[in-house]
Amino acid sequence: MANNNSSNNNELLVYGAEQAIDQMKYEIASEFGVNLGADTTARANGSVGGEITKRLVQLAEQQLGGGRF
């Protein structure tokens, strides 16, 4: 595993990725009927985050030829 001395492990490495992730977040929230914000339950917000992760993994698998590692 790479040695990362950065204190922020969520640092985006691709320019423009933040906007794409935000767009994905709001699209998924809309699909799930979740209004993102401070008044939303952690469970609802977490379901959106979990779905983002699931879709990003699917995209990566497609780009890598669908192989499992």
Swiss-Prot record:
The keyword Metal-binding does not apply. The record marks E27, I28 as: Cleavage. InterPro entries: SASP_alpha/beta-type, SASP_alpha/beta-type_CS, SASP_DNA-binding, SASP_sf_alpha/beta. Gene3D superfamilies: Small, acid-soluble spore protein, alpha/beta type-like. One of its GO terms (biological process) is sporulation resulting in formation of a cellular spore. The keyword DNA-binding applies. Belongs to the alpha/beta-type SASP family. SASP are degraded in the first minutes of spore germination and provide amino acids for both new protein synthesis and metabolism. This is Small, acid-soluble spore protein C1.
